[in-house]
Amino acid sequence: MALKAEDSFDIYSQLIQSFCRYAENTTVSESQSPAFNAQKEFQTCQDHACCTHSEAHTHILMQQWQLLEEQWEYIDHLKTDVAALKQLLHGFMNSLSGTDSGMEGTNHFLPPHQNPTLLKDEEIVASALNRPSVDINGFEENITTGAQIHAAFTKSPKKMPATSTPRKSEVLWSCSPTLATDGYFMLPDIILNPLDGKKLVSMLRSSNYEPHRFAELLFQHHVPHSLFQLWANKVNFDGSRGKLGLPRNLMIDILHQTSKRFVLGPKEKRKIKTRLNLLLRTRQDRAWWDVGL
């Protein structure tokens, strides 16, 4: 039996509507199924994990940048410290080289107008004795031993006729002392004992930081007791009063070492001279000599 066209169209429309309802119901059922929900949750977790990983990476980068800024700031501080150290080192080197700027900033013991290390030997001696400076470069330096110094004090008369008696003016020294330009006789130079830092500190403490006492300890350090016994009552500081003067190198060293550690004015120089002259007037026991050192 043949169907009409209108009836066929209605049948097709119903079929299409039924198919659409079936598709909608199938979609709703799938969205409500456990598998679909699990897949959706998995996708959400993946999105959240990606977001968390990005935030963590950004946080790490920020920490690294902050650390770099702190390191640069520390380097700037180091540059400032190095510049300050260079300036201090420059000033210290100037003080060692004896420049005016260095001496004004670091040397508190010596006046700026007098630096003993820059004075000549003859100027040091002349300044200590309050005499005009003289040129002593023409005199021969005679370094002698203790035996030669001992021989210098062994008097022997000239060979005279048997009937004559030698006068005091005719008594000679077997080793002639040095004649200075001012007419005073000075003993020949002696070998000076080395002075190390430990000994120097001990002498400064024993002297109670008094220049004349320190000069006396230097004298005892350089002059053996046996040699001092020969000098006693025959030698004084500068060779005045008809006596022999101390060896030139001994005087120079005593004044130089003392001037390096104390300010020596006219008063201090007179005290040093008086102290050594008082020491040379009488003989001293060996025990006292050793205790002094």
UniProtKB/Swiss-Prot annotation:
GO MF terms held by the record: DNA binding
Function: Probably plays a role in germ plasm formation, positioning and maintenance.
Key words, A-Z: Cytoplasm, Developmental protein, Differentiation, Nucleus, Oogenesis
InterPro entries, sorted: BEN_domain
All copies of domain BEN, residue ranges: 187-287
Main subcellular location of this protein, as a coarse class: cytoplasm
Quaternary context: Interacts with poc1b.
Subcellular location: Cytoplasm; Nucleus
Gene Ontology biological-process entries: pole plasm assembly
Tissue: An mRNA and protein component of germ plasm and primordial germ cells (PGCs) throughout oogenesis and early development, being first localized to the granulo-fibrillar material (GFM) of the mitochondrial cloud in stage I and II oocytes and to the periphery of mature germinal granules both in oocytes and in embryos. Shows some somatic expression including the ectodermal cells of tailbud embryos. In adults, only expressed in ovaries.
Record-given protein name: Protein Pat
GO cellular component: cytoplasm; mitochondrial cloud; nucleus; P granule; pole plasm
Organism: Xenopus laevis
Record bears the keyword Nucleus: yes
